[in-house]
Amino acid sequence: MKWQQRVRVATGLSCWQIMLHLLVVALLVVGWMSKTLVHVGVGLCALYCVTVVMMLVFQRHPEQRWREVADVLEELTTTWYFGAALIVLWLLSRVLENNFLLAIAGLAILAGPAVVSLLAKDKKLHHLTSKHRVRR
């Protein structure tokens, strides 16, 4: 077994994903040391948003090559969602001083995608034709 496969089995992440994690940690440390952590956090969140928009655009592209790029971007955004959510919560904590509002924002940011996904699956179950019986 190659060493890349051993790393993938042990961590669940590919080598390029691990390198991106280390790069983001290095950027956050440099931002902290140079007292520009807020700017670095905003920049990382903006980069995440651009990546999500590019993923959504490329998923509908007629050429297969661009859809494969969208698959890579989807894997990247899935990997980085939790980190981006924590950076957003930290940035919100710099502006909001109400802990209750921060808790609600945290629940919305962290649990929101799971709830939307479950609701979307539930709607799909109601649109089945009568020949596709679903036991409940």
From Swiss-Prot:
Residue spans, topological domain Cytoplasmic: 1-12, 59-71, 121-136
Cited Pfam families: YbhQ (PF11076)
Record field: transmembrane: 13-33, 38-58, 72-92, 100-120
InterPro entries in the record: Uncharacterised_YbhQ
Annotated localization: Cell inner membrane
Periplasmic side: 34-37, 93-99
Membrane topology designation: Multi-pass membrane protein
Sorted UniProt keywords: Cell inner membrane, Cell membrane, Membrane, Transmembrane, Transmembrane helix
A Gene Ontology cellular-component term: plasma membrane
Protein name from the UniProt record: Inner membrane protein YbhQ
Organism encoding this protein: Escherichia coli O6:H1 (strain CFT073 / ATCC 700928 / UPEC)
